[in-house]
Amino acid sequence: MNLRLLLGKGRPLSLLFSLQLLIIGANAQSHYTSSSVNILVSGTSSLHDWTMKDLKADCAATLDLNAAGQLDQLSTLSFATPVNALKSEHSGMDNNAYKALKSDQAPQISYVLSSATITQTSTGSTVTCKGKLTIAGTAKDEDLIAICKTNPDNTITVTGTKKISMSQYNIKPPTFMLGAVKTGNDIVLTFNLILKKA
């Protein structure tokens, strides 16, 4: 049967346009932003282990969930936090850390995704991210593994850890107490984020 005769003059184009809109809508990804952030930076020193906490980071992502509600695609992801948002229990330690991180010249730490590989598990999605991490003004390609779980309220919890060597970012490990206490070169970044639909 002739589709044009069935639909009438002009209607095939309207139908085609409607189908295109449906296809675009089906493939459209959603934008998510962080509603809760908990970042811990931990390391060692010649005296004791230390930890700095950050609750002011921002994260944004463009993603898609499958029919089961699990993360299916991750197209974009960006993360940024002010260096001065990192806080420990000792202001003297904070100031030395900011100096080591060159906060005057490079006030932000950031990560921008270039690609992502997603593996589905029984409890969520494991995401292997490739992207550019910038610390103290030095940018490096870094892989980052995150576990993503969709919550009953449709938010997404993102957790993971990443070990970083300060020397790779041209950072001289800070010292304290007039140099008597020296920090180790390696630090561990632990993150727990909650993303909500924007």
Task: Give, region by region, the residue ranges found by the protein language model.
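Bacterial N-terminal signal peptides that target proteins for export
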Residues: 2-15
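Intrinsically disordered, low-complexity segments enriched in small/polar residues
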Residues: 6-8, 23, 67, 177
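Bacterial N-terminal signal peptides
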Residues: 12-24
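Low-complexity, acidic/polar, glycine-enriched regions of mature
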Residues: 28-198
